[in-house]
Amino acid sequence: MASIIGIDLGTTNSAVAVMHGGEPVIIPTAEGGRLCPSVVAFTKHGERLVGQIAKRQSLTNAARTIHSVKRHMGADWSVNIDGKPYSAPEIAAAILEKLRADAEAFLGGPVTRAVITVPAYFSDSQRQATRDAGRIAGLDVVRIINEPTTAALAYGLAQENLHTVLVWDLGGGTFDVSVLELGDGVFEVKATSGDTRLGGDDWDQRIVEWLVEDFKTAEGIGLRDDATAMQRIREAAERAKIELSSTVSTRISLPFIGARGDTPRHLERELTRAQLEHMTADLLERVVLPTRTAMADARVTPEDLDRIILVGGLTRMPAVVNLVTELFGKPPHREINPDEVVAIGAAIQAGVLAGEVPDVVLLDVTPLSLGIATAGGVFTRIITRNTTIPVRKTETFTTAVDNQSAVDIQVLQGEREMAADNIGLGRFQLSGIRPAAKGIPRIQVAFDIDVNGIVHVSARDIATGHRREVKVTPASGLIPEQVDRLIAEAAANRERDRRKREVAELRLRIDDLMTDAERVLADALGKLPSVTTQPLADAVEQAKQTPAGAGLGQLRLLADDLQRISYEVMEALYRYNAAERAARAAGVPTAGASEGEAPHADGDTASADETSADGD
């Protein structure tokens, strides 16, 4: 049976893992990393780039590069590229396709099934959008699972003498906290809470705002409308945030960030950990209420917790660790890389579903209450939050006016008392109700939540047997027919997309080789004769003139020629430098090679057209 992979579809980075030899293993990306940046870009030539290659070119292509798409899952959001709108599931699908391709390369065969993780506090619309993304990527999403639950799996906590565990997950774009009860291989989530709009991106944005405002005050130059400058600042902000987790201050240096007239201006700022903690104090404060809510819902105190697990890259920050320690009165555990722990847990759950991991049972919960709108605009709950899933519950309702022959049923998710303040999941009408005085008809409304946390709703008139089911469509606007079309498009274009990616990667390789070649040529100036360096200069010029429509064969030839000729010139330069050092050591004066001459290893020079010693 083909392996089921586990995917952590993250806001900043994503990861994929699989059970291999009985152990969960992170699958490396094609570029050699363990994490894949959750970045998708479209080049001006129409190629789609994903991951590290997309992130590398974002400075020169900021307007066509998409970051943090996870924050838009389930929302009515799209990005327009060359006149074509792309929804959040379509962009996320590009990331999932990349992870799937990396997994296939690692496993040496096709991959069609996956477990995909989501924040515990994701709504039904967000979960549906994630499932759609998987389908568009050509994956059968066998389970949508909450990230904190997979973290507990990764730690193998059911095998230890632990009973109550709290998972505290602060990632790139979302925050979750879950309380789990463990015993005899059973992982039961007792309560969950969180904020799907809080994460590392918000810390980055505070640094960005500080840099932009500070630069405007100091230089009188606004940078907000300069897409390239803002992308440079965002990348610098993220680097600074990461560095301040391990050092007390960092230097942010962005030369030529702007100009006043013809005079370039540079951004040079020192940022301390104390400054960052001060400017983000309110963000950190926002994690406190969801943490206390989850504990109250689970009816536990800090003393009841056997272990606190930290998940997510932002939990490396000392301020975060200190806050968690203060909240619970005990230090958290961070033995597993917080950026990889969710993918590892997803692989274990995939192993459970494939029968590779025995004696483990997951009992997850729904993060928000589900119900319908009733008379007076009230939200009537049918399934309350933190109910263990899968679950089915029914309630009986009646009509509000005499001789009512139909009822509109509005399906909602949330915790507010009024219907208008909650998340609308769908609406449908049950007709054919037998005319009667109000309060007489009996209408049974049933809510089903499956193991993926996805909702199915039906209504039935008990007297007539008439029944209707709601089609819960995510706010992303993708109906099943659209998803099917996108799946077909992705499958039909997979080979073409692979070739486009190869072309894009080759172009980037050629750009890197040209940069290296120009550096070599600059270093060789005055040292090597033009007969040695001219082929490299010609190759660089030829690469610069490459037409936009150049094919794979032409690009490979260009790249190989550039690399080969560069090596030849570098070898000649190495021999020259070695000869020069030897001459200096011997006290012999040296000079740069003249036209048509190249240095010998002993420090002498020989004409390029010099004949052999015997004159033949």
Regions found by a protein language model. Name each.
Residues 1-75, 79-85, 101-616:
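Oxyanion-binding/catalytic loops of NTP- or PPi-dependent enzymes
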